[in-house]
Each structure stands twice: as C-alpha cells, then as structure tokens.
Amino acid sequence: MTDSLEYNDINAEVRGVLSSGRLKLTDQNIIFKNNKTGKVEQISVDDIDLINSQKFVGTWGLRVFTKSGALHRFTGFRDSEHEKLGKFIKDAYSQEMVEKEMCVKGWNWGTARFMGSVLSFDKDSKTIFEVPLSHVSQCVTGKNEVTLEYHQNDDAPVGLLEMRFHIPAVESADDDPVEKFHQNVMSKASVISASGESIAIFREIQILTPRGRYDIKIFSTFFQLHGKTFDYKIPMDSVLRLFMLPHKDSRQMFFVLSLDPPIKQGQTRYHYLVLLFAPDEETTIELPFSEAELRDKYEGKLEKELSGPVYEVMGKVMKVLIGRKITGPGNFIGHSGTAAVGCSFKAAAGYLYPLERGFIYIHKPPLHIRFEEISSVNFARSGGSTRSFDFEVTLKNGTVHIFSSIEKEEYAKLFDFITQKKLHVSNMGKDKSGYKDVDFGDSDNENEPDAYLARLKAEAREKEEEDDDGDDSDEESTDEDFKPNENESDVAEEYDSNVEDDSDDDSDASGGGGDGGTDGSTKKKHKEKKNEKKEKTHKEKEKIKKPTKKKDTGKPKRGTSAFMLWLNDTRESIKRENPGIKVTEIAKKGGEMWKELKDKSKWEEAANKDKIRYQEEMRNYKSGAGGGSEDEKGGTSKATKKRKSEPSPSKKANTSGSGFKSKEYISDDESTSDDQEKVKEIPKKKNKSTAEDKDKNSKKSESEGGDSDDASNASEDDDEEEDEGSD
C-alpha cells in the first residue's frame, strides 16, 4: 500500500464556490490547501465517520462526513482514479467508498432529514439536494413555512439568497413540526447573535483599515466591531491569519487580521483588519470562565485573569479562540535595525516586512504575498544619481507588485534574504556578485563612473550633431528652391520693353563673384537632377492612369438562378408571414425556406429556360447582331483616348504666344512647365555660355531680331511636320 495519495488540481466546496487546491490523503489525515488563500484544512482519521463517492458534471468526487456532523466535498477526480482511491481508503481508513445515489426526477416535495449539520431533502431514500447548515445565516418561521437565509460568498458569480420550505400541519403530532424544524436548523446554523456575555471587551481601539476607532467585543464564535458609524460582526472561522508586526520607529505595534470573506463598507471590501497599538498601553481583563472550563475547553492555554500591553492580551485571546498562530517578522533585520523596510506601494508610503514564508506590506492597501505565489523578483534601479531602487514581485498569475523608493542601504540585506529563501531573481546574470558590487555595493561613492549614463550622453550628443547637420542641409535646400519672384521674372522677360536690363542683371549675377563660381555650378547640377526626377515621375503618373470602361447597355442579361426566381415570387409572402422583417434578413429567411423546399422542379425548369435564352442572345451579340464585342469597343475607345491625351507640343507652342523664349534668355533654373520640352532640345553647350557671349547675343538680337523670329518659326513648323508624320 502507498503511504499517501496527492492530487494537485482538486476543488473543494466553500460556501457555494468550488475553490481549487491540493488534496493529500495520508494514513493519518486528509489535508486540503486552498491555492487562493493558502488556508489548510485537516481532517483526522479518527474524526472520519463516513466516506462516499458522488457523481458531478463531467467528473466525480468525495463526500467526507465527520463525527461532528460536518460535510466536506471534494471534486475533480478522473474516472481512472476511482479504483485506486477506493482501495487506499479501504486500507488506510477501513471505510468502504460507496456511491451516493441522487434523485434526478426534479420533484419539489419530499422528506427533510437532519444528518449532523446537513439538511438532506430526500425522495424515495434518494437525495434531491443537501444544505450544509453552517452556510445558514438566519432562519425565520411562518405559519406553515420556514425560510432559510444563507451566507454570501464574494467569489461566487451567482449565489443562493434564501430557500422556503412548506411544512403541512399534522393534528395528531404533539410537537409543532415548524418549530421542530426551526430548532434543528438553529442548533447547527452559523447564526451570529450577540446574545450572551462577551468574553472580552477592548475600548477605543484605533483601526487603520477600515479607518476609525472601534470597541471590540469578543464572543466564543465571533467578534464584533462597534464604531460611531459602522458595526461589523466577523465570524472566527473567517480569520485566515494573524500578524503581529513592530513599527519601524518601535513606538507602535501593528496587529493584522487576514479575512476571507472580507468585510464590506459600502462598495469597498476590506480583506485585512489593521489595528494600531501603543506599546505602553496596558490593560487587565478577567475571562468569564471557571478554571474547569479553561482547562477542558481551551486546554489550559488561557488564564482567568490576563494583564499586560493591550496588543499582547488581545493577541493571546484571539490566538486561542480562532485557533491560529500569530506570525511575527522573522529573522530579517534591515539597515535601520528593524524588520521594516520603508517603501512606497502605488500612491502611498508604507512598510514592507519580509517574513519567513512571504512578504506583507502595511498599510494602504495592506498586501500579503506568499513565497509559493511568487514567480520571480526583480531589483530595478531608479537612476544613477538617485539613492533608491525599486523591488518588483511577479506572481505566477502574471500580477506584478512594485515597491518603489527603497533606500540603497537596504539592498544588501534584502538581497541576502532573497537568496537565502531561494527566490528567482529575474534580472540576475551568471555573475551574481558582479551585479551586487557594481550597482549597489558602495552607495556612498557617487563619483564612480556610470557606464550606462555615459552611453546615454554619447548617444544624445550624436543625435544633436545629426540634427544640426540635417538643419543645415534643410536650410540650403530651402534657399535654393525658394524663388518667390520666379513667375514674375518670366512675365517681365516676355512682355517688358526693357528686356536687356533683366538679362544684364541675370548675367551679372551669374558671372559676378569669382569665389562662388564652383558653388553655383554644383547647385545647377543638383537642380538639373531634381528637374529630371520631377519630369520622370510626372510622366510615370500619366502612364499609370487608365481609362475607365463604360458599361455596355446592349449586352444581354445573365440567366437567373432557380433560387432567385423562387425568391422573387415568394418575397411578398415572406414579408406577410414575418411582419417587421429587415430587408437584409429576407434573403436569409428565404435561404432557410429554400433548403426545406422539396419540389424545386418548377423553378429549375424556369432557370434552364432562362439560361438557354441568355446563351442565344449572347451568341447573337458576339456575331454582331447586338453590336460590337466589348473588347473591340474597348480597343477603339483606347485608341481615340490615346490620341486625345497626347497632343503634339508644336501645336501648343503655336497657340500660346507666351510660351516663346529666345535662346539667350533660357536658363535651366528658369524653365516653366510649358517649355520643359524646349529646354531639353537646347544643347548644354549654349546654356553654359559666358558673360561675353551673352553680350554679343544681346547686340545681335537687337539688329537681327526679325530674322531670328522667322528662323525659329520655320524650325517649329518643321518640328510640327515631323510630329504629324510620326503620328
């Protein structure tokens, strides 16, 4: 026989919610540990009264009855594990794992049976449903009915609020069945009532969350917080953990209670109660128990009279009544000589306490992180000149908690603690000591060179130099391209009477200044390349544009399908049968009806006839009866469009008188869009004439202006004839 069985993915029922966790069965105990809260529940072998198996949706589970009447249900077992688990229970616990039969008829009348702390509603000896009475918060009786109210679980998306039982009156019965039912429920229900004498009362205790001063009354099964505005009744079994932590200045003490389920104040939930005490405040209380009760009920852990600091007295009473040990700060001692590490979490400052099995942050908001929840931790630097760092904790569920503004002096102690607990550090390389020594080894020596900061400065310097170079080049390019009076100078050269003055200015500007001659030539080359690129892109865009095809109205209409013929015929009937139907949904509805239609021969014959009609008309259309084919029409239209879109440049020159320029006035940087073609035809040698050649040409133009005009017109006529011949 195996010593134990362990299952990592088992769900336990907790107030209507299946909480995941780990289940371990040994020959001494059945242990379940909740993954979310870390709460551990143990069932001793001596306390087990009955073990059954029960079928659930898609799986099966265990029902464990204890001798005290409590019912524990665990689900999530595979079918293959049934035989193995049954054999282990028989050998280890001497129990037969019998299957529990359930009634699935759906009836709402039957017999109510009380078995321990469970109300079972049966029909024909089969259980319809079960109600753990520990989930009942209140029981109210009526004339012939009983109403049960239940505790709510915040993790449950849907919860049962109340249930009513109708109990018919029986004349022969001596006892009232309604009253008897009520007594059976209340004897096992978890009803919080402040009746009876309280065990201890602590007055005006300062609580940080929820904020205020409260009187704390402790009863045997719950404790009550009574404030000026709010009152809370908290069951003892809802307390998960107790923490007693000293303040960093050692002048105050924190007493923290972890709650599940949390208490509510409006829409705010408080998972932790944080009580604040002064160490010098003392109190003396006397418990209302006899010596025999203290010895038998509490095993001598409490004395009849308790005295000392308030936090010690309250902690001792809570520890015994709740049955949980108080967790202290552990062995960690920070740079300040205390267990608290000052830091900021979210928007508030507080203290981080490294514990033996986790971290706890106090106080706004309080947070407890167990080591088994942590995936990795990370030490993040806040900057080379700052004297603090950030501590990042990444959980296995992906959540990241960042504790910032921690003093660098705390790094060595915190790092040693983490390595001792064997937590994974995400930003640690192979050389752990190197990171420790370089980043935080000597926090006082701020004059050591920072390689990271130096690299950032170098990159910023390079970027500034690149930006300066880019600005210079941009300024040069804008100066070259910017010509506000370019169009005005063109008009002046064409139509002004004093043309020689403008040309002389241009020649003086081009020829003057011997130092800038080389710069001017390079600029002209740069402009020529730009103009050539612009002309190429303009021509390419013209080539890309394609004429749109016009729809041929004479082309025959395609044949209609059988479905469309049927839909056109039944469209009105669909609208009548479905008033308010959308236009887009008519086709969808018709498709469903078409699939269900069995006899489609009528519409298929009509579709075939329409198809034959289309083929005949298309044959006549292509042969020429219905007009030319679409391709032929498209071809002719393309040809005509091409001729229209490509007029000869000579015609354009003749029609516009402003487009003419004599050769001596044409320069590469003063060409308009109309005479770009002419600029290309002029040889470059003539464009690179010196100032002397320009003077000679200007004198010749005065005397031979008429001859040059005739010659240019003749050359243009020759060019026009050549273009027409090429077309």
UniProtKB/Swiss-Prot annotation:
Name of this protein: FACT complex subunit Ssrp1
Annotated stretches, region: Disordered: 458-565, 596-727
GO BP of this protein: DNA repair; DNA replication; regulation of chromatin organization
MF annotations from Gene Ontology: DNA binding; histone binding; nucleosome binding; RNA binding
Organism this protein belongs to: Drosophila pseudoobscura pseudoobscura (Fruit fly)
Extent of Basic and acidic residues compositional bias: 529-555, 596-620, 675-703
DNA-binding region location: 556-622
Gene Ontology CC: FACT complex; nucleolus
Subunit-structure text: Component of the FACT complex, a stable heterodimer of dre4/spt16 and Ssrp.
Signal peptide residues on this chain, from the entry's feature table: none
Gene that encodes it: Ssrp
Keywords tagged on the record: Chromosome, DNA damage, DNA repair, DNA replication, DNA-binding, Nucleus, RNA-binding, Transcription, Transcription regulation
Summary of the function given for this chain in its UniProt record: Component of the FACT complex, a general chromatin factor that acts to reorganize nucleosomes. The FACT complex is involved in multiple processes that require DNA as a template such as mRNA elongation, DNA replication and DNA repair. During transcription elongation the FACT complex acts as a histone chaperone that both destabilizes and restores nucleosomal structure.
Similarity comment: Belongs to the SSRP1 family.
Predominant cellular place of this UniProt entry's protein: nucleus
Location of the protein in the cell: Nucleus; Chromosome; Nucleus, Nucleolus
Skewed-composition ranges (Acidic residues): 464-479, 487-508, 704-727
Bias-annotated ranges (Gly residues): 510-519
